[in-house]
């Protein structure tokens, strides 16, 4: 049974201040939760229908499990079609390693305020094998539920950092790391041979 306290916590995770307070974020749906179970992230709890728990019980050792019915799931889900499972995971602490950034391709995001767009960018970055993503304070939160959903699991694999981009770019340019900009009339990234190291800078939507 889903308690009122847990229901309130899950509902509050829509807001950044509560995600920071509890150090948790929400993952909805069978596919994303399936990816979460195979990721290194620490799962705080799983809220699910009994049928889903029975089908997946072999993968659920050492996980705090809460059974829920349809009425209870309606109260905590953003989906129009109810998911069978919702997970709460701890927000990971990513360690910045300069030597790793200097030897790879990273993404720098300025003012990406729409969480859905940010999640899509994370997904594309993951597809290209980009592992480090730097955001400024004007970007949406990467653990916003809309961003998590749009990332389609990339959020479990890429490392994200919020930082002063001018300081970061200055420091890494001094180390000789090339910087690439994105433009509407530029070359198609899908048909362009990318460097194996450097910073790709993307600006805001507007």
Regions found by a protein language model. Name each.
Residues 1-54, 139-140:
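Boundary-proximal intrinsically disordered activation/regulatory segments immediately upstream
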Residues 21-24, 42-45, 62-64, 132-133, ...:
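Short active-site oxyanion
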Residues 38, 98-189:
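RNA substrate-binding interface of SAM-dependent RNA methyltransferases
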Residues 49, 68-69, 88, 136, ...:
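Generic beta-sheet signal
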Residues 59-69, 104, 193-199:
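Active-site regions of enzymes building and remodeling cell-envelope glycoconjugates
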Residues 63-90:
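Glycine/small-residue-rich loop that forms an oxyanion/phosphate-binding "nest" at active or ligand-binding sites
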Residues 85, 150-154, 197-200:
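Short, hinge-like loop/turn segments at secondary-structure boundaries
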Residues 181-206:
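Active-site/ligand-binding-proximal alpha/beta "capping" segment
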């Amino acid at each position: 049974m889903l308690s009122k306290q847990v229901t309130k916590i899950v509902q509050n995770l829509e807001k950044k201040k509560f995600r920071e307070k509890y150090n948790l974020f929400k993952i909805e749906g069978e596919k994303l939760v399936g990816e979460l179970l195979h990721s290194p992230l620490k799962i705080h709890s799983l809220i699910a229908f009994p049928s889903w728990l029975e089908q997946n019980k072999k993968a659920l050792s050492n996980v705090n499990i809460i059974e829920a019915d349809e009425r209870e799931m309606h109260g905590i889900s953003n989906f129009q079609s109810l998911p069978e499972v919702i997970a709460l995971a701890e927000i990971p602490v990513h360690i910045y390693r300069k030597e790793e950034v200097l030897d790879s391709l990273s993404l720098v995001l300025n003012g990406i305020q729409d969480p859905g767009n940010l999640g899509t960018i994370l997904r594309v970055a993951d597809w290209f094998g980009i592992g480090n993503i730097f955001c400024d304070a004007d970007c949406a939160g990467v653990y916003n539920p809309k961003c998590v959903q749009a990332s389609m699991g990339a959020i479990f694999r890429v490392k994200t950092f919020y930082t002063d981009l001018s300081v970061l770019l200055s420091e890494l340019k001094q180390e000789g790391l090339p910087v690439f900009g994105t433009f509407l009339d530029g070359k198609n990234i899908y048909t362009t041979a990318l460097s194996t190291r450097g910073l790709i800078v993307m600006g805001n939507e507007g």
